[in-house]
Amino acid sequence: PVLVTLWTRPITSKTPLAIDNPEKLGTMAVAELLRHEGISVSKADSVSKAVEASRNGATIAVVNADRLSLAERKALAQAGGDVVIVGVRGGSDTLKGLTDMTSKGAASPGSTILEPQCGDADAQAARSLAGSHASVSLQGDDDAVGCFPVGEDRYAYATDTLPSGAALRVLADPGPATNAHLA
């Protein structure tokens, strides 16, 4: 009998906010926490695959949403699954096609502890955020709910209803989802 073993290294990424990035700016820790809770976590290599997964009830987390075309954002908004936007760039069209909320550059220092000040169950479960490097404005979006205010009409986290009826959640600053924050 012969036993052959092959030592391999796990494939990891250095891409910021990637679920397979174990470095400070990665989100491997949050992916592992979700898996521990029984939630399947995977990455889609195309918008069409993400839209298909959304049609099948998956929640889609989007980083760098500003790199999607307006048509791609609209397709996600219509697909039927919940969408979570992780990180927005102030003044960009990151949210266009998904909601009437707009991304803003207003921020609060990391030393500031933000309280939810809304009834959203996820925000209440989080209890607080340590500052925010970005925000969203609800101006022009009458049914959106802002949480963790960083200033007048500026929120670190907000929710809205997508055209499909599913939920949109926006975490303006991706920092709280990173390995550095969860370590």
What do the PLM-derived regions correspond to, one by one?
Residues 1-183:
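Short, surface-exposed patches at the edges or C-terminal ends of soluble domains, predominantly
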